[in-house]
Design a protein with these regions (language model features):
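A short beta-loop-alpha structural element at the N-terminal edge
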Residues: 1-15
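Conserved GNAT-fold acetyl-CoA-binding loop/helix
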Residues: 18-41
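A short helix-loop-beta-strand connector motif used in the catalytic cores of GNAT acetyltransferases and
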Residues: 42-54, 84
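Conserved beta-strand in the GNAT
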Residues: 54, 60-69, 84, 89
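Conserved acetyl-CoA binding element of GNAT-fold acetyltransferases
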Residues: 76-92
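Conserved hydrophobic beta-strand within the GNAT/NAT acetyltransferase core sheet
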Residues: 85-88, 118-122
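Conserved acetyl-CoA-binding loop-helix of GNAT-fold acetyltransferases
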Residues: 90, 96-109, 132
Length: 153
């Protein structure tokens, strides 16, 4: 089951976000992730700047997607009007079981429904996954060296 995020899911998202950041080898302390970052995500979500979808196995949250339509109001706007998957995570024990693909399709559908004909994302280690989902690796990279992938409808 995949649900839209709401503030009652804050703790669940914070737990997954902590695991996600650890996997990325981020130096952001856990208390910041569970505090200010979680508050920031709530604020951006409430303003309608980002959308968040969380996948569950029963009551257990197992994956999330944070995405937006790039526009000037957002804190990240590389390609105005494009759909952008900002953050994406599937718990390790649920990888290679189809959860990631289902959540990706769900996210893409919503972005398309919001008016995006073109999508992009950045990735450090999941390029093969995204390519299997129909995304194309571009020659461009972010200032942090992340690969940029695109998908067009």
């Amino acid at each position: 089951m995949i649900l839209d995020y709401n503030p009652s899911m804050k703790q669940q998202l914070a737990c997954m976000m902590t695991a996600y950041m650890a996997e990325l080898k981020s130096d952001i302390p856990e208390e910041i992730i569970r505090g200010r970052l979680s508050d920031y995500i709530d604020e951006m979500s409430e303003k309608g700047i980002i959308r968040i979808r969380i996948a569950f196995d029963g009551q257990l949250p197992i994956a999330f997607s944070v995405f937006q339509i790039d526009r000037q109001e957002s804190d990240w706007c590389m390609r105005p009007g494009w759909g952008f998957i900002r953050e994406y995570y599937v718990s390790p024990e649920y990888r290679k079981q189809g959860v990631g693909k289902i959540l990706a399709e769900d996210t893409e559908y919503i972005l398309q429904d919001l008016g995006a004909a073109d999508l992009y994302l950045t990735s450090t280690g999941a390029v093969p996954f995204w390519q299997k989902c129909g995304w194309r690796l571009t020659a461009a990279v972010t200032p942090k060296g992340q690969s940029i992938l695109e998908k067009h409808f």
